Swiss-Prot record:
HAMAP family: DnaK
Name listed for the protein in its UniProt record: Chaperone protein DnaK
Keywords for the protein's UniProt record, in alphabetical order: ATP-binding, Chaperone, Nucleotide-binding, Phosphoprotein, Stress response
GO molecular function, one term: ATP binding
Region Disordered: start-end pairs: 602-642
Positions of modified residues (Phosphothreonine): T198
Gene that produces this protein: dnaK
Species assigned in the record: Dichelobacter nodosus (strain VCS1703A)
InterPro entries: ATPase_NBD (IPR043129), Chaperone_DnaK (IPR012725), Heat_shock_70_CS (IPR018181), HSP70_C_sf (IPR029048), HSP70_peptide-bd_sf (IPR029047), Hsp_70_fam (IPR013126)
Keyword hit for Iron: no
Signals that turn on the gene: By stress conditions e.g. heat shock.
Xref: PANTHER family: HEAT SHOCK PROTEIN 70KDA
Family the UniProt entry places it in: Belongs to the heat shock protein 70 family.
Function: Acts as a chaperone.
Span of the signal peptide: none
Length: 642
């Protein structure tokens, strides 16, 4: 059985890990870094992923996609999506089914399709490291992701050519990595996870089961799927735009090139202010008007940054209060506080967490890597490499159906341990009602319309009867990934109807299949591209070697040999201008044949020279041997005292 890798599919950065013996190991990507920017760019027919995409973002803002995780599994009309439309340089559009998609060069693409590109890079990173094909993964999601977002993440995995063995909550994964690393011990851990685009808080209990191993049980979880480092960056960008407008009278908000440079500068300034009190923001030629080019030169202090984002930090504390209340714990019950996500490196965030929980957060957990490591450990559990670990996660939001009067009736309460099942008997609202519509909801509001609609289906052919008489059993079944299956059964007739919730905003099987084919086609394109490069490099090396041999041999090369070889080189250089690998290989072989006599002469000359050098070296060694003088020696002791 192959290894099951662990992937932290982040809003800003992604990370991949795999079990290496008894521990999880984060794998470096092809650029040599342990995290990969979750950025995809489309440039001149080429798809760039990670650092290469980030590097060209300033010059190609409309075709560079970042923070796509904030759109995954979301409807176009959601207020969070509408807010993002005005903040990003790329086009967010409404798909035929009402989803939020993106548009690049007139082509609409689904967020899972974009995220799949990042997952493919993570997959290839491990494949290059292990030297084997990877087909299975555990992928993490924010604990507060709803059913649609989880399903869309699973779709992204399928498109990337991965069987997603488990969807695991990010804070749970971090606690798993932390708990396994420090050994079995009873503890109650608060995981504060403030990433690039989402925020989660989970309260997790670890229990030492002696010979049976270690149990990780999530007691409560809460969060905000539209709060993260991107929002902190946006506050800095808005501040810079306003300051520049005051100074120069120019509004930069409609200049996508300037905004991309501001985004880059804001992120850099934010990082610098975690370790220094002040930073300079210098952006020459940020724009121009009739009077000439304009430059931005501003100082940003840590205090100013803290004032700009104070409400965002405060916003993260309300879910903490709710989670603690749901877990039935007080601050004194918490053993350890773990910080996860790059934004937790900000000193003001650390201070807020410390003040809230009344204890210093632990600094021995890498906030960028813990989630991927936990996912790899869960992969190890599922693959049988990691023994004696029991993980009990929860559903983050309540699940139920719409009943008479537009009310949501809950069947499964939030923070229920999964997998789980629940059933309830309902009846008809009118006399002789022959069908009922089961409308499935997720959320905490009493009013059905205020919650997230996950889907609906009909149970028909109910025998005529007075209202309230038929007995319809509705059953909810949540699997270990937090994905829901709902069924409704008429107790009298035994007729049953069921639905696996793929969410009204999910992709159809046909769409996923098409995207899988597209991804495979791109993988084949990438392979051919790599093959072309290697073939061209090999041809170039061959040309260099032959030209060097001709130069070194001089008059030893006959005019006929030289003429034949130069003609072969010219023919090879001509085909190297194209993209036909087979033609390049053919002309490379032709050059090898044409230059064979020259290369034989060059080899013979080199062998002769080596033998000559070896002979001279032996002679010198003999002379040195004659010069050796035998001598006695005695140790001279110093009178110096230490």
């Amino acid at each position: 059985m192959g290894k099951i890798i662990g992937i932290d599919l982040g809003t800003t950065n992604s990370c991949v890990a795999v079990m290496d013996g008894d521990s999880a190991k984060v794998i470096e990507n092809s650029e040599g870094t342990r995290t990969t920017p979750s950025i995809i760019a489309f440039s001149d027919g080429e798809v760039l992923v990670g650092q290469p995409a980030k590097r060209q973002a300033v010059t190609n803002p409309k075709n560079t996609l970042y923070a796509i995780k904030r759109l995954i599994g979301r409807r176009f009309d959601e207020k969070e999506v509408q807010k993002d439309i005005n903040l990003v340089p790329y086009n967010i559009v409404k798909s035929d089914n009402g989803d939020a998609w993106v548009e690049i060069d007139g082509k609409k693409m689904a967020p899972p399709e974009i995220s799949a590109r990042i997952l493919q890079k993570m997959k290839k990173t491990v494949e290059d490291y292990l030297g084997e094909t990877i087909t299975e993964a555990v992928i993490t999601v924010p604990a507060y992701f709803n059913d649609s977002q989880r399903q869309a993440t699973k779709d992204a995995g399928r498109i990337a050519g991965l069987e997603v063995k488990r969807i695991i909550n990010e804070p749970t994964a971090a606690a798993l990595a932390y708990g396994i690393d420090r050994g079995a011990k009873d503890a109650k851990i608060a995981v504060y996870d403030l990433g690039g685009g989402t925020f989660d808080i989970s309260i997790i209990e670890t229990i030492d089961l002696d010979e049976e191993g270690q149990q990780f049980e999530v007691l409560a979880t809460n969060g905000d799927t539209f709060l993260g480092g991107e929002d902190f960056d946006r506050r800095i960008i808005d501040y810079l735009v306003n300051e520049f407008k005051k100074e120069q009278g120019i509004d930069l908000t409609s200049d996508s090139l300037a905004l991309q440079r501001l985004k880059e500068a804001a992120e850099k300034a934010k990082i610098e202010l975690s370790s220094s009190q002040q930073t300079d923001i210098n952006l020459p030629y940020i724009t121009a008007d009739a009077s000439g080019p304009k430059h931005m030169n501003l100082k940003l202090t840590r205090a100013k940054l803290e004032s700009l984002v104070a409400d965002l930090i405060e916003r993260s504390l309300e879910p903490c209060r709710i989670a603690m209340k749901d877990a039935g714990l007080s601050n004194s019950d918490i053993t350890d506080v773990i910080l996860v996500g790059g934004q937790t490196r900000m000193p003001k965030v650390q201070e807020a967490v410390k003040n809230f929980f009344g204890k210093e957060p632990r600094k021995d957990v890498n906030p960028d890597e813990a989630v991927a490591m936990g996912a790899a450990i869960q992969g190890g559990v599922l693959g049988g490499q990691v023994k004696d670990v029991l993980l009990l996660d929860v559903t983050p939001l309540s699940l139920g159906i719409e009943t008479l009067g537009g009310v949501m009736t809950k069947l499964i309460e939030k923070n229920t341990t999964i997998p789980t099942k629940a059933s309830q008997i309902f009846s008809t609202a009118e006399d002789n009602q022959s069908a009922v519509t089961i409308h499935i909801l997720q959320g905490e509001r009493q009013q059905a319309s205020a919650n997230k609609s996950l889907g609906r289906f009909d149970l028909s052919d109910i025998p005529p009867a007075p209202r309230g008489m038929p007995q319809i059993e509705v059953s909810f079944d949540i699997d270990a990934n937090g994905i829901l299956n709902v069924s409704a059964k008429d107790k009298q007739t035994g007729k049953e109807q069921s639905i696996i919730i793929k969410a009204s905003s999910g992709l159809s099987d046909e769409e996923v299949a098409r995207m899988v084919k597209d991804a495979e086609a791109h993988a084949e394109e990438d392979r051919k591209f790599q093959e072309r490069i290697e073939t061209k490099n090999s041809a170039e090396s061959m040309i260099n070697g032959v030209e060097k041999a001709i130069s070194e041999l001089g008059d030893e090369v006959t005019s006929d040999e030289k003429e034949k070889t130069e003609a072969a080189i010219k023919a090879l250089r001509e085909v190297m201008k194209g993209e036909d690998s087979d033609a390049i290989k053919e002309k490379t072989n032709a050059l090898m044949e044409a230059a064979s006599s020259i290369m034989q002469k060059a080899y013979a000359k080199m062998t002769e020279k080596q033998q000559s050098d070896d002979g001279a070296g032996t002679q010198n060694a003999d002379h040195k041997e004659d010069d050796v003088v035998d001598a006695d020696f005695e140790e001279v002791k110093s009178d110096k005292k230490d």
